[in-house]
């Protein structure tokens, strides 16, 4: 276990606004940003997404947190073995923003799992490009939120999703959001992430993959 470090960061919920901080490698047509979320559009979006290394190299917000979690990310052996059993190919599409603390505390662990699992491939896009899918896969309290992680099959059909936070954290944090006391309680949220070290995120994500393999669309907490 690495040392517990809690960064003093501004309180925020990861509900993206109009501005985006993660460019696509090529400019997406306007039709893509506003199209109905169908498989053809997902194929285009995924193809234009960034690899994990390209995204990570360009992170310019909360970078210290991204770096810490990438450096220390480990996948428990039991979860790695279960992911190996899922097979593939599966495409993992992450809709995210570098400034989102939930993304910085979860995506490095998902990326670590993908890197070590044959049959999985990862691409990342920003919230502007992924807006239709954010709207279609809202958080339990009704927000279009980042990160939104979609598991796609070979035909780019959605076979599972993971939205914003582990369910165990939502049980604490969503009431905080409802009360509007994020600034006062964000330290507890960051401490939860630091203590958990990605385990709950990975456990839930593996359940999503296992659901995809069995034909069940799993979206924890929804």
Model-assigned labels for residue ranges:
Residues 1-7:
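Sec-dependent signal peptide recognition
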Residues 9-90, 111-119, 136-145, 159-222:
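Non-globular targeting/processing and membrane-anchoring segments
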Residues 93-98, 110, 118-134:
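Thiol-based oxidoreductase modules, predominantly thioredoxin-like and allied folds used
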Residues 97-105:
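Conserved redox-active cysteine motifs that mediate thiol-disulfide chemistry
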Residues 154-158:
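Short, glycine-anchored, charge-dense loop/turn motifs used at functional sites
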């Amino acid at each position: 276990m690495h040392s517990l470090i809690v960064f003093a960061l501004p309180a925020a919920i990861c509900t993206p606004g109009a501005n985006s901080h993660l460019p696509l490698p090529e400019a997406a047509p306007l039709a893509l940003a506003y199209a109905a979320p169908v498989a053809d559009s997902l194929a285009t979006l995924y193809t234009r997404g960034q690899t994990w290394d390209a995204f990570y190299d360009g992170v310019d917000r909360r970078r210290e947190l991204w770096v810490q979690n990438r450096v220390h990310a480990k996948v428990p052996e039991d979860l790695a073995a279960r992911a190996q059993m899922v097979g593939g190919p599966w495409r993992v599409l992450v809709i995210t923003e570098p400034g989102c603390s939930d993304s910085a505390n979860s995506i490095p662990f998902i990326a670590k799992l993908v890197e070590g699992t044959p049959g999985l491939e990862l691409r990342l896009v920003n919230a502007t490009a992924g807006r239709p899918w954010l709207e279609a896969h809202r958080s339990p309290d009704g927000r279009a939120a980042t990160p939104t992680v979609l598991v796609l099959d070979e035909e780019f059909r959605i076979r599972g999703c993971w939205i914003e936070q582990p369910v165990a954290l939502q049980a604490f944090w969503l009431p905080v959001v409802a009360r509007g006391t994020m600034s006062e309680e964000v330290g507890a949220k960051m401490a939860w992430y630091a203590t958990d070290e990605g385990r709950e995120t990975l456990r839930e994500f593996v359940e999503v993959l296992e659901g995809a393999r069995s034909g069940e669309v799993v979206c924890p907490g929804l």
